Amino acid sequence: MAKEYKTITQIAGPLIFVEKTEPVGYNEIVNIKMGDGTVRRGQVLDSSADIVVVQVFEGTGGLDKDCGVIFTGETLKLPASVDLLGRILSGSGEPRDGGPRIVPDQLLDINGAAMNPYARLPPKDFIQTGISTIDGTNTLVRGQKLPIFSASGLPHNEIALQIARQASVPGSESAFAVVFAAMGITNEEAQYFMSDFEKTGALERAVVFLNLADDPAVERIVTPRMALTAAEYLAYEHGMHVLVILTDITNYAEALRQMGAARNEVPGRRGYPGYMYTDLATLYERAGIVKGAKGSVTQIPILSMPGDDITHPIPDLSGYITEGQIVVARELHRKGIYPPINVLPSLSRLMNSGIGAGKTREDHKAVSDQMYAGYAEGRDLRGLVAIVGKEALSERDTKFLEFADLFEDKFVRQGRNENRTIEDTLEIGWQILTHLPENQLGRIDNKYIQKYHPAHRKAK
């Protein structure tokens, strides 16, 4: 039977400090017994010295030095079952939808099993999100980790929900599931997420974890690990293709900073812990495809850049670990364009692995490159027009200036419930490219122009 210690020496913020007489494991779960018989759970953060540091999930309010501490010898585990699908849970895995507790097939350590790098397969299959700026120009590939860089006041939550509703792997026989984890959200946002999932029917194939802003910061650190453990279970035990959406990683990083300050750690850049890069990697690197497994785990972490600063440590470090970024732009949002995704600073490093003949369409890469080039030139010309006026532009420059407006209005802009197939996206791309003279389509092979250009199709 586990011993009960009454050796709490200090209580600081969400942490308690306990003297130990026996070895205690890192990440071990702790039960804290209060005077009225109430039991709270905690987790060991540091056991390297004679004093054990324990973070308390429910907060330390009401605790005193006379409380009993029991080290369980177990790590935090997720009750894993296929019954997770269709459920809305708290950040620590407790039911938030009024339903019964999950009856587990397995109890899985939320820190995940180590993935052998040699067993990883390169991502190569296209995932259709139904959003043209992602599918057409910054394609998401199965097994990839592709973050969305947003900022406060921008509609990243709406984009996340739209992807959760619409995402699919065209032509795949395996089932598709979404694991959605929200961290540090308000009650209003939680109600919005819950009602959207239930109203649209997306909940049937989803597992939702919601950690509220007034929940303990400690739970915020647990939430993404709960979500990723659920995703790995569905992918590797049930052969499903799982898309994990984590929002907002900034709130997660703030919780890390708060915990570091409570432990009197030496801070790194802008007060964040020096190990934040490593910690974020333990989340992002759980995406992938494993040799011999039918399923896969794909990640879309969403983070709001403090002060719209892409060089802030959170987006900066995330960019080193992940495989590209989708950038949500305030400028496009001010124009009333949804989704306000700016394709120029956006990038999917694995895009070329997931597009082309047999995956999307043979002309996909060429159309994407040509739209990028045309839009970039049009944006540059807007700066020139602001100085010299439109009258100074040549006919060619005027065409590119108009193309930039067309690109934003026809290609970028789409409805919040508009689910475009990859064929729809490429067709819109070709329609707006007709505004440019054919001799300016230098990035598209002539055989694709003859086959797909609307002017040539009409002629046939």
Swiss-Prot record:
Pfam family, one: ATP-synt_ab
Transport among keywords: yes
InterPro entries: ATP-synt_VA_C, ATPase_a/bsu_AS, ATPase_A1-cplx_bsu, ATPase_F1/V1/A1_a/bsu_N, ATPase_F1/V1/A1_a/bsu_nucl-bd, P-loop_NTPase, V-ATPase_su_B/beta
Alphabetized CDD domains for the sequence: ATP-synt_V_A-type_beta_C, ATP-synt_V_A-type_beta_N, V_A-ATPase_B
pH dependence: Optimum pH is 5.2 for ATP hydrolysis.
Keywords: ATP synthesis, Cell membrane, Hydrogen ion transport, Ion transport, Membrane, Transport
GO cellular component terms listed in the entry, alphabetical order: plasma membrane; proton-transporting two-sector ATPase complex, catalytic domain
Single GO BP term: proton motive force-driven plasma membrane ATP synthesis
The keyword Cell membrane is annotated on this UniProt entry: yes
Matches recorded under Gene3D superfamilies: 3.40.50.12240
GO molecular function, one term: proton-transporting ATP synthase activity, rotational mechanism
Membrane topology: Peripheral membrane protein
Localization in the cell: Cell membrane
Family: Belongs to the ATPase alpha/beta chains family.
Misc note: This organism has both a Na(+)-translocating F1F0 ATP synthase and this H(+)-translocating A1A0 ATP synthase.
Biological role stated in the UniProt entry: Component of the A-type ATP synthase that produces ATP from ADP in the presence of a proton gradient across the membrane. The B chain is a regulatory subunit.
Record note on quaternary structure: Has multiple subunits, A(3), B(3), C, D, E, F, G, I and K(x); there may be a few other subunits as well.
Full protein name: A-type ATP synthase subunit B
Record organism: Methanosarcina mazei (strain ATCC BAA-159 / DSM 3647 / Goe1 / Go1 / JCM 11833 / OCM 88)
